[in-house]
Amino acid sequence: MGRIIKPAFTVIGMEGSTADGHGFIPALWETANSRFGEVAALAKTREDGSLCGIWGAMSDMNRSFRPWEEGFTRGLYLAGVEVRDDAQPPQGWVRWDIPGFEYIRVENNAPDGFPRTLKMIAAEGLTLAGAVHDFTDPATGKSYMCFPVRKL
């Protein structure tokens, strides 16, 4: 666990909603992964050419990047890749411009990681400043949950 500062960034991906029913997130990833070639050239890369990040970005239903509503059961999800700021989505893809935040970043390796981190945030007198995002670091293959605690 640690804190990171992430300035505003852009993700292009496949968007879905909890209204789409159980299993919508894996279905989004299946579609995004199978069509990745359509956005690969737009992806933001590091100096070594590796991708900067794969994001499971989340937002409230109004796309204002607030936490999911109704006890974290109602919201939007974007399965995608971090892209250059000037990138435009191909047909069928969606672009989200995610505001900058300070995040508490926790490795996503335990089923109780989400509620446990929410309790820790509350114990420190903090609150969520936005929606939690899933992040996979392509360089290491590790997955993290990013809990925003301060908007930049």
Regions found by a protein language model. Give the residues of each.
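A solvent-exposed interaction/effector surface
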Residues: 1-152
